[in-house]
Amino acid sequence: MTVWLRFQPISGFRASMQVIRGKFSARADPGEVSSFQALATELSGTVGLGNIAGVAVAVSLGGPGAALWIAAFGVLGMSMKMAEATLGSKFREIREDGSIQGGPMVYLRDGLASIGYRRLGVVLGSAYAVFTVLGAFGADLFQTNQVAAIVADSSGSEFLQGNTWLLGAVIAALVGIAIFGGVTSIARWTSRIMPAMAIVYMLCVFAVIVVNLDNVPAALGAMVEGVFTGEGIAGGVVGVAIVGIQRALFSNGAGVGTAGMAHSASKTKHPATEGLTAMWEPLIDSVVVCMLTAIAIVVTGKHLAGSGENTEGVQLTASAFSTVADWFPLLLTLAVALFGYSTLLAYAYYGEQALTYLFGYKKSIIYTFRVLGIVGAVIGSAASLDAVIAFGDASFFLMAVPNILGIYFLAKVVRLEIFGFNRRLCAGSIEAVEDEDLRVGLVSEDPTPEQTQRAEKEERAEKERLRTLHRTLWDDPHFPVRAAHHGDDLASPMGTPDEPIPDTGQFLAVEERRSEGDGGAGSGPAGGGSHRAD
């Protein structure tokens, strides 16, 4: 996907910064949250205990080299996240009340139907929704297990260490307060928690590295050497790679599809903007946070005492933090609590989206799921680490299978959407929302009636401009008409000048095709090239 999108995570850096600031989104645009809030929600589900406990598990099982595999998978995962978020925004459903239904289950069903694979889309979409419910419980169990473990350990109370379910009950109550407020409530909580927990945790990690600064060169050398040698229970390069990729998948979620759900709720008219936003998630998660966590563990040498099978996850990271001061693991406890809490909120939303897809929006089903999630938090706090990791890995793998298969078939749609947006942006046909009262910004707010009227007026003017462009192109005898090949991503379904206006990106894509000549017919991952109709 990285090659197919021509390294967009690198070339799209400037545009992504503008998108995150809400420069191209108006408050009256369809959606519920800003692009930044969607980014914070997804990061809350990825930058969490997968970075703290997951990296500790990876280093214990596969040695220091597993950390570099996590980082490598994170870089490659940027394009996968772009694809998921773009498709999630493109094929979302907007209900009458303005709420959003989106995610892989929707783009698998509707996206595959649009290219002639309707039955396959229905099967994959339904399967993904079922697996997402399992994945939500898997995340629930893992997060509460590790939060309860480190809180009990930090307290020094033998009573709490023997009754971690009590801590699980407290966590469950706090989660219940937030999730019964819906997606906007979740977005508000995560967008506030995310910066605070990131700052606290990163400062702690830097402190550990500075205290053990003399060991940094040796630690980096061990990581590079460990990429190809491996050690312990998962010895060998294949074993190290598997462990690293497993933990990266559990950590950054690239390929799992959750980005499609988080970004489907964003206020935007351009699906590609969400791809440009989501691409940062694996970079922040796997390359920055995971790598720094791994370095902090390796420089202290605490991983050498792990036997692999009996690894304690987050407690290994806490042991590394104790090299700074005896009280320092308390700061990690605070960060873990915030990480785990925000992740629980994010996956509660994902599970509800899946259930809504399967059964429609029925309060009885949604409330039952929320109650079961709260009960699951209590169960997870008392379960063994090995059990919750096994369940979480299995559920995430099941989610990834239909999602990655669907993205393979929809690869052309993704490229057309992203390239079309870039061309329109360069051509000036996508204008920034300069009025601060109309722009979404970092945090979404509902528009006033006056703002809605102004936005609708601008939208009517834009539609008229596109209609004029449509008629002009229709009158051009050299411009291609209806595609001869169903699902062709480079031909424009022009129809007649009175039909609905096609996506401007299709016009620009055809111009790209024409400029490349007849020999420029592309062939994507899912099939053959384009054909022009006479």
Regions found by a protein language model. Give the residues of each.
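Alpha-helical membrane segments and immediately flanking helix-loop junctions
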Residues: A28-L61, L87-F91, E96-G111, V123, ...
